[in-house]
């Protein structure tokens, strides 16, 4: 079973259920007496459920599963053509990640992007964090709510954004203004660099 098809943790599985993610099966610790709201939603959606010993969950994932694991279809990503269509639909605020490879960091960034109301996240096909269970859990399920555009080269996406008169600004850890406080123009996208090298 591919790690990218596994999600775990109560909040993550609940968010998947709320967002109509295609869930194949849910595994719950048979000794867990809680999670009634999750169990109810699983039954409502006629999803296969299996009550298993904790050891089974530990074998399915090394992450902090909190007594629940689910298998899902891979997270769908979009391409450069889809990005262009999104811009045509008046979406201008994107977060562009340049070589962010840590799964937990990526998940946390996705969560922040959703809070900021970004229209999507742009990553490259190579040199970017995989979208796996750890990423999904770190995003607290936010990854189900925000489009992820995966492109061959980041520069192609930036060129497309600029061609549509979208301003590109960069995030810097030494910057004086918090991203939460800064007032962006309507047509602004943000580039964020990697953990080690930056942009």
Predicted regions and their residues:
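Short basic, glycine-rich beta-strand/loop surfaces that mediate nucleic-acid
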Residues: 62-73, 139-145, 183-194
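Glycine-rich nucleotide phosphate-binding loop and flanking beta-alpha elements
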Residues: 14, 34, 58, 76-78, ...
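RNA substrate-binding interface of SAM-dependent RNA methyltransferases
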Residues: 33, 87-177
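Conserved acidic residues
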Residues: 24, 119, 188
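Active-site/ligand-binding-proximal alpha/beta "capping" segment
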Residues: 169-199
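Gly/Ser/Thr-rich beta-alpha loop segments that engage phosphate groups in nucleotides
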Residues: 11, 109, 143, 195-198
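Short secondary-structure boundary/capping elements
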Residues: 5-8, 101-104, 195
């Amino acid at each position: 079973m591919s790690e990218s098809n596994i999600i775990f943790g109560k909040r993550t599985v609940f968010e998947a259920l709320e967002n109509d993610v295609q869930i194949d099966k849910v595994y719950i610790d048979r000794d867990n007496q809680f999670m009634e709201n999750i169990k109810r939603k699983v039954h409502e959606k006629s999803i296969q459920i299996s009550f298993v010993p904790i050891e089974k969950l530990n074998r399915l994932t090394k992450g902090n599963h909190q007594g629940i694991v689910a298998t899902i279809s891979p997270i769908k990503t979009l391409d450069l053509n889809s990005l262009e269509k999104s811009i045509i639909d008046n979406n201008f605020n994107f977060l562009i990640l340049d070589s962010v490879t840590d799964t937990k960091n990526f998940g946390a960034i996705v969560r922040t992007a959703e809070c900021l109301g970004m229209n999507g996240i742009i990553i490259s096909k190579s040199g970017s964090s995989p979208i796996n269970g750890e990423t999904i859990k770190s995003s607290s399920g936010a990854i189900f709510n925000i489009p992820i555009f995966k492109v061959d080269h980041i520069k192609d996406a930036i060129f497309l954004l600029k061609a549509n008169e979208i301003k590109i600004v960069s995030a810097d850890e030494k910057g004086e203004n918090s991203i939460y406080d800064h007032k962006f123009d309507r047509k602004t996208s943000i580039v964020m660099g990697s953990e080690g090298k930056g942009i």
